Structure formats: structure tokens, C-alpha cells
């Protein structure tokens, strides 16, 4: 484990150096210069208001993991803590393309919004939504019908594979609806509506997932209740975020 930790730190350091060299080199369109590295308060406020969304998402994910591991250790023991680790690894791999689609759409949406091209922004939202939904639906199908194949990638232990297969189907039951959350939050961040993005990030993780993670096992669902909290939050939080986006930002741009 020590070797893995050291390797992670080394990879992060190398990645940081590589990015800094590129951004300060001749190939960068806007190269970094030390003499121009100044802090402008009016820009800092906007940067922080949007950047805090990502921070909150990471922080709430950690909070959820703490709650999940605590409840699983009580109701299921080390086996189910390991199962959650396997499922989280699968989830991280599956969410990367969806995040890539929505994150990649942000500059396009922001540019056209700033240029006043509202119909292009609306078209971009539709395309992004369709692409993300098609992908998450295909990923959901794969997780439902080939869970054993996915679990074997991350563990050779048969007992853990069997437990992971059962819980993976529960955990991924609402994965398709996660695309609604990604798309809605991406639109809010692209338009600079940070308050909406923060609100729905907190809604899904802090208001829905954490309480359900603590409550469902206590009402007789045991370890299944811990994994069931995720699909419930995906459905409720995802639909709430996307419908709000359609009724506010998307509708407003249709009038302009």
C-alpha cells in the first residue's frame, strides 16, 4: 500500500510539472508569465464562485464515503466495505465519459452565451443532453447485464464478486438519471449560475444520500439500504436539477 501511495504522489507531481511546462512554453496560446501573475479581485470572485462547485462536489463525495463505510462496517463488516470499494471503482470508470461530455460542452455553451447566441446555447444543451443520456443508458444496460464481468476486473475473490454483483445492480439502478444531474449542473456552471449548481450538488449528496445512508439500514434494509441510497438520489436529485434548468435557464434563453 505504501508503494501505491508513493506512486500516486509521484504521478501527481510529474503531471503538475508537465502541465506547468506546457502552459509556460511556446506552444501555449496564452503562455503563463511570472511578471503577469497578478491577482485581480473582480476576477477572483467569479473564479471562486464557479470553482467552489467542484470543491463541494468532491467534499460531499468524501462525506458520503465516510457515511457509507461506517454503516457498512456496522451492518456488513469488511466484506461489504470492500464491495463498496469495487463498486466505486466501476462507477468512477463509468462516469468519466459522461463527465467528459458535459465538461467538454461548457466552453461552447459559455462562449455562445457570452456572444448572445442563445439558440446555439439551447442547441448545445440539447446535443449535450442527448449524448450524455445515450451513454448513461448504455452504461446502465451493461452494468445490469454484465455485472460479474465488471466486478472480476477489480477483485479475484469469489465471495466479494458474488456480493458485488448483487449490490452493483442496486447501486446502478438509477445510473441513467445521473446524466440529468451532470447536464443540469454543467449548464448552470457554463452560464455562471453558481448558486443553482451549488444547491443541487448539496441536494443530491448532503440532503438525500447521507440521510438515506443512515436511515435505510436502520429500517430493516441492512447493507442493501446503504447501496439503495445512491439510485434514489440519482433519480430525485437528477430530475430536480434538470427540470429546474429547463424551467429557468433553457426557458429564459428561448425568450431572447
Q: What do these predicted ranges mean?
A:
Residues 1-51, 109-174, 216-256:
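Short alpha-helical transmembrane segments in multi-pass integral membrane proteins
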Residues 3, 61-65, 77, 99-103, ...:
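Functionally critical, cavity-lining and gating residues within the transmembrane helices
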Residues 8-15, 19, 23, 41-104, ...:
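Transmembrane helical elements of multi-pass membrane transporters/channels
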Residues 9, 54-62, 74, 92, ...:
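Residue-level hotspots within the lipid-embedded alpha helices of multi-pass solute transporters
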Residues 38, 78, 87, 99, ...:
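Short, well-ordered coil↔helix boundary/capping segments
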Residues 69, 81-141, 145-147, 178-200:
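Small-residue-rich hydrophobic transmembrane alpha-helices
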Residues 72, 76, 113-114, 155, ...:
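Short helix-loop-helix connector
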Residues 209-217:
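Hydrophobic alpha-helical transmembrane segments in multi-pass integral membrane proteins
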Amino acid at each position: 500500500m505504501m508503494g501505491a501511495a508513493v506512486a500516486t504522489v509521484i504521478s501527481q507531481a510529474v503531471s503538475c510539472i508537465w502541465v506547468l511546462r506546457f502552459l509556460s512554453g511556446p506552444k501555449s496560446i496564452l503562455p503563463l508569465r511570472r511578471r503577469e501573475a497578478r491577482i485581480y479581485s473582480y476576477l477572483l470572485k467569479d473564479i471562486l464562485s464557479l470553482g467552489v462547485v467542484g470543491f463541494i462536489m468532491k467534499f460531499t463525495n468524501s462525506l458520503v464515503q465516510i457515511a457509507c463505510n461506517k454503516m457498512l462496517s456496522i451492518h456488513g463488516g469488511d466484506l461489504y466495505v470492500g464491495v463498496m470499494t469495487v463498486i466505486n471503482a466501476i462507477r468512477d470508470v463509468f462516469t468519466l465519459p459522461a463527465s467528459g461530455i458535459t465538461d467538454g460542452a461548457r466552453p461552447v455553451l459559455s462562449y455562445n452565451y457570452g456572444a448572445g447566441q442563445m439558440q446555439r446555447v439551447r442547441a448545445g444543451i440539447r446535443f449535450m443532453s442527448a449524448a450524455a443520456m445515450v451513454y448513461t443508458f448504455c452504461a446502465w444496460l451493461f452494468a445490469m447485464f454484465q455485472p460479474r464481468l465488471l466486478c472480476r476486473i477489480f477483485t479475484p475473490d469469489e465471495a466479494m464478486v458474488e456480493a458485488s454483483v448483487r449490490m452493483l445492480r442496486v447501486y446502478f439502478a438509477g445510473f441513467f438519471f445521473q446524466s440529468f444531474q451532470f447536464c443540469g449542473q454543467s449548464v448552470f456552471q457554463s452560464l455562471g449560475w453558481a448558486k443553482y449548481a451549488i444547491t443541487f450538488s448539496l441536494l443530491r449528496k448532503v440532503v438525500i444520500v447521507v440521510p438515506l445512508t443512515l436511515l435505510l439500514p436502520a429500517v430493516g434494509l441492512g447493507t442493501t439500504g446503504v447501496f439503495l441510497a445512491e439510485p434514489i438520489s440519482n433519480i430525485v436529485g437528477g430530475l430536480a436539477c434538470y427540470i429546474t434548468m429547463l424551467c429557468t435557464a433553457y426557458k429564459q434563453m428561448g425568450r431572447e
